[in-house]
């Protein structure tokens, strides 16, 4: 009798396994919900790194006077002279 029973179970395993797994999962889900109790209060979402960066950039921009800009001639002086004046003998 046992060999016949095992043959039937092996043949119909997909049809037996899903309902058993479904029942075990549902019982586990409800048991966990019962043990855990009420849901905790929602926590305020923290600002993302991108949002914090944008806020910081906006704060920095508010403190600056955008009418005062550095001229392009002054900006060129910060580059290494060896690179910019290599082929210009009048600047050496």
Swiss-Prot record:
Name of the featured protein: Small integral membrane protein 12
Subcellular localization, as worded in the UniProt entry: Membrane
GO CC annotation, single: membrane
Transmembrane segment boundaries: 15-34
The keyword Signal belongs to this UniProt entry's keyword annotation: no
Family to which this protein belongs: Belongs to the SMIM12 family.
Any Pfam family hit: UPF0767
Classification via PANTHER family: SMALL INTEGRAL MEMBRANE PROTEIN 12
Principal place of residence: membrane
Membrane topology of this protein: Single-pass membrane protein
Keyword entries, A-Z: Membrane, Transmembrane, Transmembrane helix
Keyword Iron: no
InterPro entries the record matches: UPF0767 (IPR031933)
């Amino acid at each position: 009798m046992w060999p016949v029973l095992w043959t039937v179970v092996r043949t119909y395993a997909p049809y037996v396994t899903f309902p058993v797994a479904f029942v075990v999962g549902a019982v586990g889900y409800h048991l966990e919900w019962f043990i855990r109790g009420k849901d905790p209060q929602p926590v305020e979402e923290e600002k993302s790194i991108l949002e914090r960066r944008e806020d910081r950039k906006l704060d920095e921009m508010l403190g600056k006077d955008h009418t005062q800009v550095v001229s392009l001639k002054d900006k060129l002086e910060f580059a290494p002279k060896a690179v910019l004046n290599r082929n210009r003998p009048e600047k050496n």
